[in-house]
Amino acid sequence: MADRIGKPVSQRQLRVGEMIRQSLGMIFARNEAKVPNLETNTITVTEVKMSQDLKIAKAYVLPLGGKDSELVIKKLKECSFLIRKALSKKIIMKYLPKILFAKDDSFEYAEKIENLIKQTNK
């Protein structure tokens, strides 16, 4: 796996990304961030990609059922400081990364590819 400029992702980036993904999953499952007007126990964190300097984490999330994903992403972005505060209690790092949230489209993409394969096999 390589990032946008072609440099390979380091083991440290992968390890820290996975640690943040697991911690975010626990935070959402237990509603530790206290995000208002959001059912956080239905959010799945599918992947976290770290920048090379480990100061930015891009978390790909998907609400259960995939509905209202734009609203969920908007609420998460608005309350990212609460989530980061809850994350700081779980992970000890010199610099806790800034968390950016994005919708995970990989399941929709995989379904689209499957449908194309089924159409060609007919």
Curated annotation (Swiss-Prot):
<comment type="function">
    <text>One of several proteins that assist in the late maturation steps of the functional core of the 30S ribosomal subunit. Associates with free 30S ribosomal subunits (but not with 30S subunits that are part of 70S ribosomes or polysomes). Required for efficient processing of 16S rRNA. May interact with the 5'-terminal helix region of 16S rRNA.</text>
</comment>
<comment type="subunit">
    <text>Monomer. Binds 30S ribosomal subunits, but not 50S ribosomal subunits or 70S ribosomes.</text>
</comment>
<comment type="similarity">
    <text>Belongs to the RbfA family.</text>
</comment>
<dbReference type="GO" id="GO:0043024">
    <property type="term" value="F:ribosomal small subunit binding"/>
</dbReference>
<dbReference type="Pfam" id="PF02033">
    <property type="entry name" value="RBFA"/>
</dbReference>
<dbReference type="GO" id="GO:0005829">
    <property type="term" value="C:cytosol"/>
</dbReference>
<dbReference type="InterPro" id="IPR000238">
    <property type="entry name" value="RbfA"/>
</dbReference>
<dbReference type="GO" id="GO:0030490">
    <property type="term" value="P:maturation of SSU-rRNA"/>
</dbReference>
<dbReference type="InterPro" id="IPR023799">
    <property type="entry name" value="RbfA_dom_sf"/>
</dbReference>
<keyword id="KW-0963">Cytoplasm</keyword>
<dbReference type="InterPro" id="IPR015946">
    <property type="entry name" value="KH_dom-like_a/b"/>
</dbReference>
<keyword id="KW-0690">Ribosome biogenesis</keyword>
<protein>
    <recommendedName>
        <fullName>Ribosome-binding factor A</fullName>
    </recommendedName>
</protein>
